[in-house]
């Protein structure tokens, strides 16, 4: 298993470690529910150093990223970021990503999913339009600082005034001599940021954040709570809501597809999927009867027709009830529509509901 720069730190602090996509990662510290609720009320730290970082530089950097991604990279100015997609040549998705503009037209950092890092790098290299593309994943650790008190903690630790940064921006600086990039992005629905730090400085930064945030209730958060937090927001996770066959419009990601820009990989087929009409939608749902939804469970109409599949499901710590995300036939996708969920041969009632499940 691969280890992040924080692996030894997690062990010393008593985290329960597991294999996650080939990485030795903390699934929880004191318990999923407590960690989840702490991020919703105080502040939590996430080790996201397993995520991949791909640098795209040079005179052809913008042209390359415009071709590789569905969103319009040309709109980004220095210090701005955007959520985007890497479309494949079959009408599905290689990955969902965040593009950070470090220097307009010529220097970008692309953050990719841990499980897709090698695949993404190979894809980007194969379809390069002449940029200098390098895998910088081993150079960086990454810590997400999330929660209502996250910005207060950041302002205590960093010279950069994070509380004054706009959402989806990035600034470069240093921490105890180590290069850092602070990005006001996240995966929880809370205020906060994600800090790229030179690998050698990651453990020191983690311990400093814990110490400086003690009175704010700061604690380490495992992958278990990271997943329940993102599920409550109906944020997509690759391998669940999206994969290499997903129609991005059906997944609710049409807002990051820009047909007006000159061209991108497989543009005609991707945009054509919307014009052809959608057959299913990605929706949130709640249970009306006892049961926890899990990925792969089938959805049925009341006349016993299979109408969809669960992509993610959990017991929501914030709402204290089971919630799920599913692809469902468009005829059943309207809020308030009831259906049956097959839980190991037992069919129980559920209802399509408004998302995100948790709002501030």
Curated annotation (Swiss-Prot):
Pfam families: GCV_T, GCV_T_C. It catalyses: N(6)-[(R)-S(8)-aminomethyldihydrolipoyl]-L-lysyl-[protein] + (6S)-5,6,7,8-tetrahydrofolate = N(6)-[(R)-dihydrolipoyl]-L-lysyl-[protein] + (6R)-5,10-methylene-5,6,7,8-tetrahydrofolate + NH4(+). One of its GO terms (cellular component) is glycine cleavage complex. InterPro entries: GCS_T, GCS_T_bac, GCST_C, GCV_T_N, GcvT/YgfZ/DmdA, GcvT/YgfZ_C, TrmE/GcvT_dom1. GO terms for biological process: glycine decarboxylation via glycine cleavage system. One of its GO terms (molecular function) is transaminase activity. Its EC number is 2.1.2.10. Keywords: Aminotransferase, Transferase. It comes from the Bacteria. The glycine cleavage system catalyzes the degradation of glycine. The glycine cleavage system is composed of four proteins: P, T, L and H. Belongs to the GcvT family. This is Aminomethyltransferase.
